[in-house]
């Protein structure tokens, strides 16, 4: 192959644009600290059910719980509007001709992949709007034969599997959380919302808004300009930011509403 291909710089390979495989195990530390802050804030006002502790890295459990009219409700917490809703590596199954989620084998990562599957992420990646009709990536074709990946393979895959953003409506996110009995979400700097349904009936007493943000699924490649190595990954991100909610459980006036309706 032409030597001019060696070391070709692609914008997808930027070291500042981190993908799933770049992320350290403590990437969510700021998010965990924020969850702990809200937990302590509510706990100080006796607004947390007895015995509950934050889930931390356990993606299968709610981030927090709060009391309303004597009943506990689950709460999802995001540090800010830039927080992702899940990331994963992507690989291709040569036998089934399907993309699938892949990554680390920690409990946190496995639960995250399961959540993304339930959200239909694998289906989105395999759709015609994504990479469903693009054929077999040479990266995985080579690996299935135990052959070395070449610069030419990289150029081929970078051309035939362009990075894409696929829009996902808010109902998909709401349905996913509702299936886990989570109907409320707090986003730092934006406020507190209900998703899909408002089982606590908080709209009767507060200015809480229905979450109206939309998501986008990013599918991408990333490699190095010094070697032909590269990989594929995906991330679920906020696309259209939600309208700011006047109800915010971190603010004193909203906390007063919770306290007044605690039991």
Can you say where each PLM-predicted feature lies in the sequence?
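A short acidic/basic microdomain associated with nuclease active sites
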Residues: 39-70
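Extended hydrophobic/Leu-rich segments
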Residues: 1, 5, 18-21, 47-48, ...
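Active-site beta-strand-loop-beta-strand hairpin of nuclease catalytic cores
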Residues: 56-58, 65-76, 82-84, 255
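Charge-dense, extended regions
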Residues: 240-263
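Short, intrinsically disordered low-complexity segments
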Residues: 2, 8, 217-219, 230
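Terminal low-complexity, poorly structured segments
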Residues: 1, 14, 19, 60, ...
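A short, highly charged nucleic-acid-interacting micro-segment common to nuclease
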Residues: 3-37, 53-59
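Catalytic cores of nucleic-acid endonucleases
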Residues: 18-28, 36, 76-228, 237-238, ...
């Amino acid at each position: 192959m032409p030597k001019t291909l060696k070391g070709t710089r692609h914008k997808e390979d930027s070291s500042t644009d981190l993908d799933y495989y770049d992320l350290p195990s403590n990437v969510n530390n700021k998010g965990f600290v924020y969850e702990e802050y809200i937990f302590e804030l509510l706990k100080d006002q006796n607004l947390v059910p007895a015995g509950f502790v934050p889930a931390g890295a356990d993606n299968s459990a709610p981030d927090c719980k709060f009391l309303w009219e004597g009943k506990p409700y689950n709460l999802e917490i995001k540090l800010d509007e830039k927080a992702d809703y899940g990331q994963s590596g992507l690989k291709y199954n040569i036998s089934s001709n399907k993309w699938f989620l892949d990554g680390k084998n920690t409990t946190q990562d496995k639960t995250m992949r399961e959540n993304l599957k339930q959200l239909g992420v694998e289906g989105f990646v395999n759709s015609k709007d994504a990479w469903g009709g693009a054929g077999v990536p040479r990266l995985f074709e080579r690996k299935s034969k135990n052959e070395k990946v070449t610069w030419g393979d990289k150029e081929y895959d970078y051309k035939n599997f362009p990075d894409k953003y696929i829009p996902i409506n808010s109902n998909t996110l709401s349905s996913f959380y509702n299936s886990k009995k989570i109907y409320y979400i707090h986003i730092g700097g934006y406020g507190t919302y209900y998703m899909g349904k408002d089982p606590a009936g908080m709209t009767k007493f507060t200015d809480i808004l229905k979450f109206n943000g939309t998501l986008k699924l990013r599918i991408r490649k990333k490699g190095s300009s010094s070697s032909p190595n590269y990989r594929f990954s995906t991330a679920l991100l906020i696309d259209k930011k939600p309208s700011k909610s006047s109800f915010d459980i971190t603010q004193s006036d909203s906390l007063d509403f919770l306290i007044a309706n605690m039991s």
